[in-house]
Amino acid sequence: MALSFLPDSELTIEVVVTCDPAVTCSPEQMQAYLDTGELSALEAHEGATRFKIKALSPSDREQAEVRAGAYTRSELGRILWLDAPSDEREKARWHHELAEDEREALASYQAYLSRVFVEMVRVALVEIDDQPAGDMIDRIKPESHRLQVISELVQHIQRISLLGISGK
């Protein structure tokens, strides 16, 4: 077959998150795990909370973006976000020199991206430790862990939605 197809949106996998105290890994192991989803990339993960996620279809991803405000997001903010330097110091200086309306547009777009991530997780998260996910993601504490969990789950969701389980 010469054409490539997206994975089935019913595809599910179990993942853990690296902020879980039961997970042990170096920064390199963490990156390898996030890139591949291979639990063997982690030094240890026994007893970690397991998240069962499903792949999202293009329609699912589009609906998540719409619910997050795709039609009202700041286009100036989107352009600024794309143009932002990758070096942290350079980015800080660049951000400092933005006009007030540009800073507001960028902040608005970043808030939109956060809403997209939350919507993607709401649709894709099936279970947490074999229990229906419901609103459990909103009850993770501390807040810094909740944000990291969402961020890592989105990376896994995007990978399996676009590349499938073996996608690297």
Regions found by a protein language model. Give the residues of each.
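Short, intrinsically disordered N-terminal pre-domain segments
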Residues: 1-13
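Ser/Thr- (and often Asn-) enriched beta-sheet segments in non-cytosolic proteins
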Residues: 12-18, 50-52
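Proline-rich, low-complexity intrinsically disordered regions
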Residues: 18-20, 25
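Short, surface-exposed, charged amphipathic helix/loop patches that serve as local interaction elements
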Residues: 25-168
